[in-house]
Amino acid sequence: TDYNPGSCNIQSMIFIIMLSVLYMKMEISQAIYSSTYIPAKVLNRHEESGSIEVGKLADIIIWDVSSIIEIPYNFSINPIRTVIKSGNFVF
């Protein structure tokens, strides 16, 4: 999320995606890609994480939305239905 206690204390991924869509004019899929794969690539960890592929590490959040369009426009609610961390269902 670009969380930085000194300049940006926003911890909501959905809110950051909303800002990307509304103010940076990104497509929703582009905002999600820029929040997952691109950071992994910048950190040189894209071979092991950043996308859902066989053999990669993944922490996955499943949102309870009927369409990708809902993600940036319902940022005030918590749509998280399931959380998978290191292969374990934790929520």
Please give the residue ranges for each predicted region.
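His/Asp/Glu-enriched, well-ordered alpha-helical/loop segment
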Residues: 1-63
